[in-house]
């Protein structure tokens, strides 16, 4: 697998969960002898929602909610077969979305 790179993108609503998952991936990759770049934090996407509290006339009574989507990128340079097998067997938290791209 010479001159190949695995790019892993992580997304989660909880920053502690995504940092814990990223450290597990880095630890697993380094244990198998691969070189790791990252985790690189990407900008947090903040979505805000404003909802009218009153069912009828009061436009002044509103509640505001927001969701924050945290993102991280990891690059694993020159992975070997042991690295790929270890990453496939790795169990991450349920709240983390993982996208893996092999280039």
Curated annotation (Swiss-Prot):
CC per GO annotation: ribonucleoprotein complex; ribosome
Disulfide bridge map: none
Record InterPro entries: Ribosomal_uS10, Ribosomal_uS10_CS, Ribosomal_uS10_dom, Ribosomal_uS10_dom_sf
GO MF annotation, one: tRNA binding
GO annotation, biological process: translation
Pfam families, alphabetized: Ribosomal_S10
Keywords: Ribonucleoprotein, Ribosomal protein
Stated role: Involved in the binding of tRNA to the ribosomes.
Subunit structure: Part of the 30S ribosomal subunit.
Family named by the database record: Belongs to the universal ribosomal protein uS10 family.
The protein's name: Small ribosomal subunit protein uS10
């Amino acid at each position: 697998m010479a001159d190949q790179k695995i790019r892993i993108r992580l997304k989660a609503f909880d920053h502690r969960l995504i940092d814990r998952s990223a450290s597990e991936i880095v630890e697993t990759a380094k244990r198998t002898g691969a070189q790791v770049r990252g985790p690189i934090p990407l900008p947090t996407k903040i979505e805000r929602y404003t909802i009218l509290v009153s069912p009828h006339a009061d436009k002044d009574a509103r509640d505001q909610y927001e969701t924050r989507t945290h993102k991280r990128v990891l690059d694993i340079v020159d992975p070997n077969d042991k690295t790929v097998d270890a990453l496939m067997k790795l169990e991450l938290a349920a709240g983390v979305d993982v996208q893996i791209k092999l280039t």
